[in-house]
Structures are given as C-alpha cells and as structure tokens.
Amino acid sequence: MGKVVSVILAGGKGKRMGAEVSKQFIEINGKPIIYYTLKAFEECKDIDEIILVLPKDEIDYFKREIEPRFDFKISKIIEGGKERQDSVYNALNSIGDCDIVLIHDGARAFVSNKIIEDGIKYSREFGAAAPGVMPKDTIKVKNLEGFSVDTPNRASLVAVQTPQCFKYNLIKKGHNKVKNEKIQVTDDTMIVELLGEKVYLFEGDYKNIKVTTPEDLILAEHFVK
C-alpha cells in the first residue's frame, strides 16, 4: 500500500463565534479545537503523514502557544493561501511520493476513526470519496424573488463532510486545472467532478460537525465530556 497523507486546513476565523482568536484555537475542556482534530488523525494507524495548513500570521502563534503544550506528530506546517482552494494547492505541492490524500477541515474535531478508514478504503477503490449525511430538514430551492420553486427529494440529497479523500494524482490534476483556468470551487469533490470523474459518497456522522457558531461550540463541549 502506498503512503497516505492527511491535510488539515486550519484557516477559519472566529468571527461568528465572537472570539478574538481563530476558531481552531478556541478551547474546549482546556484544549484547542485543533488538538482534537489532529489527535483523530494521529490515532488512525493508516495515516502516514499529517500536514497542517495555517494562515501565515498564525504559524508563529501555533508554534509558540499551541505546539509546545501537546505532543503533535505533524510532518510539516504549510502557509495557507487567500482562498481554501489555494491552501489545498499549497499543501498538495508540498507532498512528495503519495498514494492517497485526505483533505479535512480543521474545525471538524469529532471525525471518527471509521470515517477516516472508510475514506481511505473507498478512495483507493473509486479514486475519490467523501462522507456525508442526509439533511434533517426539508430543502427548498427559491428564486431571486424569494419564493420557493422546487422541493428536491431529500432521499437523494447529501450534506457532504470531510475528510474528502482522493488518489493523489487525481486531485493534484484537478487543482492544477482550477488554478490554471481560475475556476472558483467550494470544496475538493467539485474539482474532481470538473474533471468528469465520479465521487463515491459514503455514510458520514451527524457528530462530525464543523464548529462554526456558538451553538456548535455548546454541542462540541458536550461531545468531549
């Protein structure tokens, strides 16, 4: 089996939290959110290397205030870009020989070992895979005037989570394409779809939340008790 690399994107600001520090550094039960995220990947036996992506102005803070407190097994810290896709591009360019790459939101601190292992398995089989859950609410499509125009079948909808998992050569090819053609994307599965490739969607977990709002933080505090 080839090498498996996880890329942890920790570039989120804490504006919606009303916090002075970036959301990945907000503490839950005495430990920053990024601690729980990194530990989840460190504890997976199939992960060979962890790359952490941080904004340029937060790398020194992490090295000074966070890293000395914990025994992280980070292979390297990469400077993020202006947009999420730029940060992923920078990380991919820092990887040498690699078979599978997992791209994960640093604020998703409660990803399970099963999701990580399933992502590796399915990306090896299909080339690209991502976890997801069925939306709990009915989803509506509205027009520019604000009126509902359609109600998609909820059974066919998936709220996609991370880690999004790929064969390295495939996602690298996709990122080169969107970089060269200046295409804006919202996640990495979209990049693979732009290549005309399919993404296998497997079962995620409602606990695998992205901690973004104060309400999410309350739920996160419950998870770590």
UniProtKB/Swiss-Prot annotation:
Keywords: Isoprene biosynthesis, Nucleotidyltransferase, Transferase. Pfam families: IspD. It catalyses: 2-C-methyl-D-erythritol 4-phosphate + CTP + H(+) = 4-CDP-2-C-methyl-D-erythritol + diphosphate. The record marks 154, 210 as: Positions MEP for the nucleophilic attack. InterPro entries: IspD, IspD/TarI, IspD/TarI_cytidylyltransf_bact, ISPD_synthase_CS, Nucleotide-diphossugar_trans. Its EC number is 2.7.7.60. Pathway: Isoprenoid biosynthesis; isopentenyl diphosphate biosynthesis via DXP pathway; isopentenyl diphosphate from 1-deoxy-D-xylulose 5-phosphate: step 2/6. Belongs to the IspD/TarI cytidylyltransferase family. IspD subfamily. This is 2-C-methyl-D-erythritol 4-phosphate cytidylyltransferase. It comes from Clostridium perfringens (strain SM101 / Type A).
